[in-house]
């Protein structure tokens, strides 16, 4: 078993995200993304891609969402996206927001 440092990797990345996936686990079955959206940052794209599904959880702070779903995503709430469904996140708050994406393959998808 391994422990993965995701928060600091996300904070120090150019995009504000860290993808914990095949490179770290050796498995194509699932992945997780830890994302940090800075105060007033907007237009962060979230899109699973063909053959993938994702559940997005607003972990810290509220997010304003546009795209496939438009409206607020309150802290502690989640949404589900499939394939080419795309959303854009905006953090209208005064402090950083954090979201977690749990992703995996759709039933018929294979790598």
Where are these regions (language model features)?
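A short, N-terminal "cap"/entry segment at the start of jelly-roll beta-barrel domains
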Residues: 1-31, 44-45, 110-111
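Short, solvent-exposed loop/turn positions at domain surfaces
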Residues: 31, 52, 67-68, 75
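Conserved short histidine dyad/triad with adjacent acidic residue
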Residues: 33-50
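Glycine- and acidic-residue-biased ligand/ion/polar-headgroup-sensing regions
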Residues: 51-64
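Short acidic-glycine-tyrosine-enriched beta hairpin
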Residues: 68-84
């Amino acid at each position: 078993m391994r422990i993965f440092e995701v928060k600091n990797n996300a904070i120090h990345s150019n995009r504000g995200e860290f993808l914990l996936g095949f490179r770290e686990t050796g498995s194509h079955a699932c992945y997780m993304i830890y994302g940090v959206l800075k105060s007033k940052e907007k237009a962060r794209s979230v899109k699973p891609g063909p053959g993938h599904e994702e559940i997005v959880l607003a972990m810290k702070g509220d997010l304003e969402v546009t795209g496939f779903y438009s409206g607020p995503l309150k802290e502690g709430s989640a949404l589900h996206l499939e394939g080419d469904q795309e959303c854009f996140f905006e953090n209208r708050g005064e402090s950083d927001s954090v979201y977690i994406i749990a992703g995996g393959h759709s039933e018929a998808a294979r790598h």
